[in-house]
């Protein structure tokens, strides 16, 4: 069986017949001696002296700024952490929820069986094809089938969600609405579970990937398919595939892929592309580039074994002009789809689902009137904290200084008012005293004049008396 990438991006099963990013499993099963050699090799690349990182206290906080690299003098043991995580993942198992979305007869059940290399949906079961009778009602149903798959001791709980009736009617107006409602309902269910349980114990019901079947018309994507992708691309990881690609010639297939990608880019539809990380080795980068170049995947699915021109039994389809092999990358993009979906990027799909869920959760809580104080989640930087405290202290000092200036101004104003009042009182008293003095002076002058007149009259009387004598 092929290798599988399971929880947290950790490959747990490896097959020598397939080379993939799951080859990293060798490091998980290595012995202590090999681990010791890897640690010593990593240590030898560092310099002997300590390397303090330059202080960037005035810059934006970086959690790696305060790290000081030191040379290890011996084996510590943290190199075995991947082994511990591997044992935990194997013990708990994994779950993966995939939505297959397309019209009836697109080959959805065949693709699922081919993808897992077993009859998850037997030919007699019509869960992915639907049976509506003679006069079906224009209704899209949502069916979910769970199956537990064990490969080399690794348990995978796979939930396949199908949509019988999708796109099968003359009037397909809003045929995607039940699908969107189901996706959002699973988000709401997960949100409700979060309120009462730790995330590590929750059985994740969210849709991790949506395999969207595009009809092989040989032309561009249809208007209905475009509307469906526009309605779902913000809620789920869309993986577009061209169903029954063996019905198209090479030129028609290349033209169809080009037109689909052009429409997706023009309408800003977000589909899932394998992410590339700086730590990826050149082989992984090349594999990612090869996978991205195949999107949308041209799929040929079959559970039938036929004999090819070389006399080998292979899964495929026989035509009068030759044999089409399912697992041959020259005939079909199915191997790359399986590699991305299960072997290399299963955990990236779940991580991207977390991002889509967080966006939905935020929108849902905000619409309910619940807002989050983002300051609670700010990283604590000592230098930034000191700078913040210094700014608060300066603000406090400035406030105290302003208050003191206000009080001082009030005191000065009150003093000036009292001085002006005293000055006015003194001026009033001065005027009153001056008026009193002027009056007293006038009285004295009047009294003097009367005395002078009396004296003159007395002297005149005296002189008259002497004359008569």
Swiss-Prot record:
Pfam entry (one): Septin
Keywords: Cell cycle, Cell division, Coiled coil, Cytoplasm, GTP-binding, Mitosis, Nucleotide-binding
Stretches for region G3 motif: 162-165
Coiled-coil ranges per UniProt: 383-469
PROSITE patterns: G_SEPTIN
GO biological process: cytoskeleton-dependent cytokinesis; mitotic cytokinesis; protein localization
Composition skew (Basic and acidic residues), residue ranges: 13-24
InterPro entries (alphabetical): G_SEPTIN_dom, P-loop_NTPase, Septin, Sigma_54_int_dom_ATP-bd_1
Residues that hold GTP according to the record: 102-109, 139, 165, 244-252, 317
Organism: Schizosaccharomyces pombe (strain 972 / ATCC 24843)
Region (G1 motif): 102-109
Family: Belongs to the TRAFAC class TrmE-Era-EngA-EngB-Septin-like GTPase superfamily. Septin GTPase family.
UniProt protein name: Septin homolog spn1
Lineage: Eukaryota, Fungi, Dikarya, Ascomycota, Taphrinomycotina
């Amino acid at each position: 069986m092929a290798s599988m990438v399971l929880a947290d991006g950790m490959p747990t099963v490896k097959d020598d017949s397939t080379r993939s990013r799951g080859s990293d499993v060798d490091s998980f099963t290595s012995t202590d001696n090999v681990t010791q050699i890897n640690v010593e090799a990593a240590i030898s690349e560092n310099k002997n002296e300590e390397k303090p990182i330059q202080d960037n206290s005035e810059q934006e906080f970086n959690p790696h700024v305060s790290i000081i690299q030191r040379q290890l003098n011996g084996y510590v043991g943290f190199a075995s952490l991947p082994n511990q995580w591997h044992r935990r993942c194997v013990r708990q198992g994994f779950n993966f929820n995939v939505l297959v979305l397309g019209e009836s007869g697109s080959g959805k059940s065949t693709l699922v069986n081919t993808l897992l290399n077993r009859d998850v949906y037997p030919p007699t079961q019509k869960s992915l094809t639907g049976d509506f009778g003679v006069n079906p009602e224009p209704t899209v149903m949502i069916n979910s089938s769970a199956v537990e798959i064990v490969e080399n001791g690794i348990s995978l709980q796979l939930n396949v969600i199908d949509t019988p009736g999708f796109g099968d009617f003359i009037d397909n107006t809003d045929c995607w609405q039940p699908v969107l409602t189901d996706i959002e309902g699973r988000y709401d269910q997960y949100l409700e579970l979060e309120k009462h349980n730790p995330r590590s114990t929750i059985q994740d019901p969210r849709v991790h990937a949506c395999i969207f079947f595009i009809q092989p018309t040989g032309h561009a994507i249809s208007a209905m398919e475009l509307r469906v992708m526009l309605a779902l691309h913000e809620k789920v990881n869309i993986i577009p595939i061209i169903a029954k690609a063996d019905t198209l010639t090479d030129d028609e297939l290349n033209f169809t892929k080009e037109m689909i990608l052009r429409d997706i880019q023009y309408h800003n539809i977000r589909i899932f592309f394998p992410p590339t990380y700086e730590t990826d080795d050149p082989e992984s980068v090349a594999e990612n580039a090869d996978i991205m170049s195949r999107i949308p995947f041209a799929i040929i699915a079959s559970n039938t074994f036929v004999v090819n021109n070389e006399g080998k039994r292979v899964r495929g389809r026989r035509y009068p002009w030759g044999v089409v092999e399912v697992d041959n990358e020259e005939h079909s993009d199915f191997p790359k789809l399986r590699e991305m979906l299960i072997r290399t990027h299963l955990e990236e799909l779940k991580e991207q689902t977390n991002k889509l869920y967080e966006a939905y959760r935020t929108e849902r809580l905000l619409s309910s009137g619940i807002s989050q104080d983002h300051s609670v989640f700010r990283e604590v930087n000592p230098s930034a904290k000191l700078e913040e405290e210094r700014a608060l202290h300066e603000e406090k000092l400035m406030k105290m200084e302003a208050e003191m200036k206000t009080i001082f101004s009030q005191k000065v104003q009150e003093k000036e008012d009292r001085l002006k009042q005293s000055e006015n009182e003194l001026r009033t008293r001065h005027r009153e005293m001056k008026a009193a003095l002027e009056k007293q002076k006038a009285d004295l002058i009047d009294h003097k004049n009367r005395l002078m007149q009396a004296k003159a009259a007395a002297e005149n009387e005296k002189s008259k008396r002497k004359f008569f004598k």
